[in-house]
């Protein structure tokens, strides 16, 4: 099946960050086979021609760190620091989850993400009360591209920890897929919730199965103080000593890093998922993304969960990310528009090991989203497309979402998920949680 999308303004996010004012994209099945400017007059014979009527077409957004199973917990524990927020609000509520609640919560997060332009994401879920196969089936049904990882903790007895490791290894062996729509990573929660032995076992599983690692690291000053007091090392050095960085690793946050740590992370291909809104809301601080990029670290933007954000709008994350860097450095050139877009598209895709997506180029997966600026005053005049995408647009502006060549959202309607049922069930299950 060959489909041509014509009469579009195409934000390619190729090496030149080229914007094609009037162009077309040809998709064959799940792959982009041509991207050109001008009227459609291709040598390709196509099955369908779709007039985009001047819509902006850009790569699907890539969320490098989130927790969709937590989506029912939006608004729980506002105005709290990370540790008391986790210990007194989030974990007690997660302990009440059943497989049905977990699926309903996941569906809500998936619906919000895909309708706001996210096509790929990397996720960590707490396995308590969760049917992991049902979660993967739910993500698959959404049509999204994802790395969904089972989180490991050292809570409970040593026997509990051993069982968690065994189950995590089985999960990795079942779901790891280097190039498919769904994959997984090895995901120890953090250095403050995992024993040294568990972190070492996670490193072993990652090496033996050739998977990536996903972990919360260097998120707060308290974490750095506590880990240094307990192990005599800061979190980065401690994680490295456990062997975690033998495989490409995504660290969520990286708020509290010094220059030598940034250099070390770059040298060892440790990537950072930058969560600006979540870090601000939990009072964790502001990650120095400018310094990370200058050190050579791969960085991707992320939302974290709705419990600490409180939405999954990647446009909002792009905007706050660039504004924060300008503010903390008192430098209006810090994290310019093109860089912010890169960190939410092709750069983010590279962070989570999905190089097959993130830009609109021949050979890439057909993952793209559209915005119709014609009826949106906040996107007018419509000639400064890149600026408007970062500084004016929001996830509510999305018209269409195509993932792997399939129309997942079309004219604002999700084709893969039952929006009415999902919203009803989310409200019903949320009322049943004991706060």
UniProtKB/Swiss-Prot annotation:
Gene Ontology molecular functions: 5'-methylthioadenosine deaminase activity; metal ion binding; S-adenosylhomocysteine deaminase activity
Key words, A-Z: Hydrolase, Metal-binding, Zinc
Key word DNA-binding present: no
Pfam families: Amidohydro_1
Enzyme class at the top of the EC tree: hydrolase
Residues given in the record as substrate binding sites: 94, 150, 189, 219, 304
InterPro entries, per database record: Amidohydro-rel (IPR006680), Deaminase_MtaD/DadD (IPR023512), Metal-dep_hydrolase_composite (IPR011059), Metal_Hydrolase (IPR032466), MTA/SAH_deaminase (IPR050287)
Superkingdom field: Bacteria
CDD domains linked: ATZ_TRZ_like (cd01298)
Residues in coiled coil: none
Bound cofactor: record note: Binds 1 zinc ion per subunit.
Reactions catalysed: S-adenosyl-L-homocysteine + H2O + H(+) = S-inosyl-L-homocysteine + NH4(+); S-methyl-5'-thioadenosine + H2O + H(+) = S-methyl-5'-thioinosine + NH4(+)
Signal sequence coordinates: none
Cofactor requirement: Zn(2+)
Binding site for Zn(2+): 65, 67, 216, 304
Task performed by this protein: Catalyzes the deamination of 5-methylthioadenosine and S-adenosyl-L-homocysteine into 5-methylthioinosine and S-inosyl-L-homocysteine, respectively. Is also able to deaminate adenosine.
Family classification: Belongs to the metallo-dependent hydrolases superfamily. MTA/SAH deaminase family.
Protein name: 5-methylthioadenosine/S-adenosylhomocysteine deaminase
Protein's organism: Bacillus cereus (strain ZK / E33L)
Source taxonomy: Bacteria, Bacillati, Bacillota, Bacilli, Bacillales
Gene: mtaD
């Amino acid at each position: 099946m060959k489909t041509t999308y014509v009469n579009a303004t195409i934000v390619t996010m190729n090496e030149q960050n080229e914007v094609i004012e009037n162009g077309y994209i040809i998709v064959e099945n799940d792959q982009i086979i041509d991207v050109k400017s001008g009227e459609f007059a291709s040598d390709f014979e196509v099955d369908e021609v779709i007039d985009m009527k001047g819509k902006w077409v850009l790569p699907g957004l890539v969320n490098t760190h989130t927790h969709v199973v937590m989506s029912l917990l939006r608004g729980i524990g506002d105005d709290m620091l990370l540790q008391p927020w986790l210990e007194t609000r989030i974990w007690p509520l997660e302990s009440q989850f059943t497989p049905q609640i977990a699926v309903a919560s996941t569906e809500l997060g998936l619906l919000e993400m895909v309708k706001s332009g996210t096509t790929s994401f990397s996720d960590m879920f707490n396995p308590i009360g969760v049917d992991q196969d049902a979660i993967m089936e739910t993500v698959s049904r959404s049509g999204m591209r994802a790395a969904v990882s089972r989180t490991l903790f050292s809570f409970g007895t040593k026997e509990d920890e051993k069982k968690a490791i065994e189950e995590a290894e089985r999960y990795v062996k079942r779901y790891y897929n280097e190039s498919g729509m769904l994959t997984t990573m090895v995901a120890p929660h953090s250095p403050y919730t995992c024993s040294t032995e568990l972190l070492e076992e996670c490193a072993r599983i990652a090496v033996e199965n050739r998977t990536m690692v996903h972990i919360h690291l260097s998120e707060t000053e308290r974490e750095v103080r506590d880990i240094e007091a307990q192990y005599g090392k800061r979190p980065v050095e401690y994680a490295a000593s456990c062997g975690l960085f033998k495989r490409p690793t995504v660290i969520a946050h990286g708020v509290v890093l010094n220059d030598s740590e940034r250099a070390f992370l770059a040298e060892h291909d440790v990537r950072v998922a930058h969560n600006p809104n979540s870090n601000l809301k939990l009072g964790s601080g502001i990650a120095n993304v400018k310094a990370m990029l200058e050190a050579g670290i791969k960085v991707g933007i992320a939302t974290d969960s709705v419990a600490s954000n409180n939405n999954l709008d990647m446009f909002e994350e792009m905007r706050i990310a660039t504004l924060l860097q300008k503010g903390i450095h008192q430098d209006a050139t810090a994290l310019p528009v093109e860089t912010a877009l890169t960190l939410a598209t092709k750069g983010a895709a590279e962070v989570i090991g999905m190089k097959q997506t993130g830009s609109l180029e021949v050979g890439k997966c057909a993952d793209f989203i559209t915005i119709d600026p014609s009826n949106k005053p906040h996107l007018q005049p419509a000639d400064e497309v890149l600026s408007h995408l970062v500084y004016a647009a929001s996830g509510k502006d999305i018209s269409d979402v195509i993932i792997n060549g399939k129309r997942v959202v079309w004219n604002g309607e999700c084709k893969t998920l039952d929006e009415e049922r999902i919203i009803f069930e989310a409200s019903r299950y949320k009322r049943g949680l004991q706060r």
